[in-house]
């Protein structure tokens, strides 16, 4: 059991028999009445995001999620294949199970596969990945009226905002949690 006062982003909890990850939370102390915690929870099985309010100090069950280190091998369109780094067993996951993680998957990348009661509920990427820029517009000197960023297409097909000095062929470090540029690698 965990108190709602100890909620943090990324925490996995059990609510009404389903597994949820805390996406966003806010402690609210109204002038009148008791304090409460307003949360956005993502269902790990369906991917649906719900809003739920808990009383401050309310106890909820923490979901015991197992993490297995695996290596991404390849995909065949709808299925993505991973290999356990210890037992060399292969696991296939559907595109829908991976969601936004697809944008940052590179061949031979080590990730964690999350399982709950023997059921695979998703993957966990490293906090940052290094990807090559395959296409971007040339940055024009003095062109900073728009905040100094431009679109760049990465080797995985993801499109992100990068500073004007980044050119095609550069390798950049990306934060996988936010999808934002961190630095040139």
UniProtKB/Swiss-Prot annotation:
The reply on keyword Amino-acid biosynthesis is no
GO annotations under biological process?
peptide biosynthetic process
| HAMAP family, A to Z | EF_P
Q: Which GO terms describe its molecular function?
A: translation elongation factor activity
What is the scientific name of the source organism? Moorella thermoacetica (strain ATCC 39073 / JCM 9320)
Q: What does this protein do?
A: Involved in peptide bond synthesis. Stimulates efficient translation and peptide-bond synthesis on native or reconstituted 70S ribosomes in vitro. Probably functions indirectly by altering the affinity of the ribosome for aminoacyl-tRNA, thus increasing their reactivity as acceptors for peptidyl transferase.
Q: Which parts of the chain span the membrane according to its record?
A: none
The gene name on file is efp
Q: What is this protein called?
A: Elongation factor P
Q: Name one Pfam family in it.
A: EFP
């Amino acid at each position: 059991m965990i108190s709602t006062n100890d909620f943090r982003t990324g925490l996995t909890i059990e609510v009404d028999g389903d597994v949820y990850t805390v996406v966003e939370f806010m402690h609210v102390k109204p002038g009148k009445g008791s304090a409460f915690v307003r949360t956005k929870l993502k269902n790990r099985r369906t991917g649906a995001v719900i809003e739920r309010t808990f009383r401050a100090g309310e106890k909820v069950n923490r979901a015991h999620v197992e993490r297995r280190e695996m290596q991404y091998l390849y995909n065949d369109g709808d299925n993505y294949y991973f290999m356990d780094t210890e037992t060399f067993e292969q696991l296939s996951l559907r595109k829908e199970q991976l969601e936004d993680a697809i944008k940052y998957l590179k061949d031979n990348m080590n990730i964690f596969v999350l399982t709950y009661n023997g059921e695979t509920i998703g993957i966990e990427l490293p906090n940052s990945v290094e990807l090559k820029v395959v296409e971007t517009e040339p940055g024009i000197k003095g062109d900073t009226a728009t905040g100094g960023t431009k679109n760049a297409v990465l080797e995985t097909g993801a499109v992100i905002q990068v500073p004007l000095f980044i050119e095609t062929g550069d390798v950049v470090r990306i934060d996988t949690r936010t999808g934002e540029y961190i630095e040139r690698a």
